[in-house]
Amino acid sequence: GAIRGRQLGAKDLLTPTSFHRENMHMEESKMQTKETFMAHPEITDQEVKNALNHAIEQVERQVPEFYDEFPAAASKDNFYPKIENVDWTNGFWTGEIWLAYEETKDEKLKEAALHQVSNFKNRIEKKIAVEHHDMGFLYSLSCVAAYKLTGSEEAKEAALLAADNLMSRFQEKGQFFQAWGKLGALDNYRLIIDCLMNMPLLFWASEVTGDEKYKEKALAHIRTCMKVVVREDGSTFHTYFFDPETGAPVRGVTAQGNRNGSIWARGQSWGVYGCAMAYKYCKDPVYVDYFREVADVFMKHLPSDLVPYWDFDFEEGSDEPRDASSAAIVACGMLEMAKYLDKEEAAYYTSCARRLLKALTDHCLYKDEKESNGILLHCTYARSTPTNTCNNNGVDECCTWGDYFYMEALVRLCAEWETYW
C-alpha cells in the first residue's frame, strides 16, 4: 500500500509544508466553507440534459471541420485553429466525439472517431511526437474508448503500442514515469501531477494482455507521486524532481502554477481525479484519504461564483483569469469516487459535482456558434508569471480538455457510464 509519510531527500532545505505555509496568503475569511459551498444551487437533471445536448450540437457542428485535423490545445479568441496530430491534447477531441456518439448513436460520429483512431495508430507506429508521458491522455480517450465501444482491433493495437511507449519512460531510480525531455537528464528528472491520468492506460493494458508489468509500474508511479506531490495540508505541487543518481526526492517546483509554493488549480484537479482513478484500480483506502484532502482544498479556494482562478494565490476580486477546466476535471473525479463511497459520502460528492457543473453551465458554457467553436469558455492553459517557467497560452479561452471533461461530467450524470480511462 501507499505510505502516508513524506520521505524527503537530503537536498530538501525546506519541507513542502513550511515552504507552502510561509508563502500562503489567502485569508481564511475569503475561503469557502462547507456551508457557503453547499448554499450554491445544484444543476438539475433537465439542465444536465439541456447542457449536454448543447455540447453535442457543437461537436456535431465541428466534426466536418476537425475530421482529418484536430482542434489546437487552446482556442484563439474562442475559436480553435486546426493542428495535425502532434500535441499531447489531440485525444480530447476524439473523446468528445465518442461521448457524443454514445449519447446519440449517430453512425457518422462513430465513423469520424474511427477515422481518427487510424490517425492515432499511424502516430504511434511512426513515433510522431510521442517522446513524453501523455500516452494516456492521447490513447485512452481515442483508442481505448474505440476498443471498448466497437471492439476495434486497430484501436487495441494502437493503445497497446502507446502503453509500451509509456513504459519506456519509467525510471527505476525514484520509481516514477519521467514526464518530459531526454530520459535521465538532470533538468528533466521529474514527475508531474498530471501523469496520474495517464496511468489508466497501463491498468487497461494489463487487463487486456494479462501481463502485470504495466499495472506494477503504474502502481509504483502512483505511490511515488502521491507521497511527494501532496503537501501536508492537502495542497499539491505541480512537479517534483528526483536525484538521478540515487532516486531520492529532491524538490517540488511549478511549471504552470503561479510559483513553486502556490496551488495551481489544474494541478489540484488532476490530484482529485487521479486519486479517484488510483482507488478505482487498486482499492487502497489511502487514496480515499488523499482524495478527501485534495478535493477539500480545491473547494475551499473557490471564489463566490465557484469558477476557479487559474491559481489559488488569487481570490475573490482578483482580475486574474479563471480556469473553468479545472472545475470540470474535479466534477468528474468526484462522480467517479462517489461510486466507491458509502451512501452519505457519495451523495455529498455528487452534490458538490452538481454545484460545480451548475456554475460552469451558468457562467462558462458557449452560447452559440458565433461566440465559439468550443464548449467551455474561460479556461486557462498556461499563464506566464515571473516565478514560473511557461509562456502565455490559451489565457481565458477554450481548452480541449475543458470541453471534454465538462461533457464527461454531464454524461456521468445522465447514465451509468463505463469510463474510457
Where are these regions (language model features)?
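Ala/Thr-enriched low-complexity intrinsically disordered regions
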Residues: 2, 10, 15-17
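Glycan-recognition and catalytic cores of secretory/periplasmic carbohydrate-active enzymes
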Residues: 26-421
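A generic alpha-helix propensity feature with a strong bias for hydrophobic helices
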Residues: 16-19, 74
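Intrinsic-disorder-associated, low-complexity terminal segments enriched in Asp/Asn/His/Tyr and depleted
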Residues: 12, 20-25
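Basic polycationic patches enriched in arginine
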Residues: 4-6, 21
